[in-house]
Amino acid sequence: LNLQKIFQMKKRLYTFIFYKLMGWKLTNTIPASLKKCIVIVIPHTSNIDFFIALLVRGIMDIQINFVGKKELFVFPFGYYFRAVGGAPLDRTGGKNNVDATAEVFQKHETFRLSLSPEGTRKKVTELRTGFYYIALKAKVPIVPVAFDFGKKEVKIGEPFTVTGNYEEDMKQ
């Protein structure tokens, strides 16, 4: 088997599991032409979220990325983490997470960073704002994604560009 056939089989398998076995729906997709963005996934309230996200990523057939502290990207796991879309976060020199993550966008031609703005799986009343300031600093759009567990639906919103006015931008 060649790699193309393997990827096609993977996509068919993910599609079958997501739509047929689990009974979920997908509204909209992230266009492959959108090379850089922050994908915010809400809510992140259970361990199943991760597996649903992996299935959706496989169905859309685009790379979705994550960041982790640079110490995770050493032998033997570093190669694997990079292969599945990971990027090391270097916070040396007193850099905060926002600055360090914005730098990661500069180092890649294509980078679609997935984040959960709650910062926890517990229900929260307010989102953490780091994702917003990363988008502002890196000059990349935000793609909102909502998991509707009642309807078994993943809703992908339209990308939007942040203006620096958090309250107004979040009304979108």
Describe these PLM feature segments:
Residues L1-N2, M9, P31, N165:
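Serine/threonine-rich low-complexity intrinsically disordered regions
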Residues L1-L3, Q63-I64:
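Compositionally biased, charge-rich terminal segments
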Residues K20-Q172:
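Soluble catalytic domains of membrane acyltransferases
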Residues N2-K25:
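N-terminal membrane-anchoring alpha-helices
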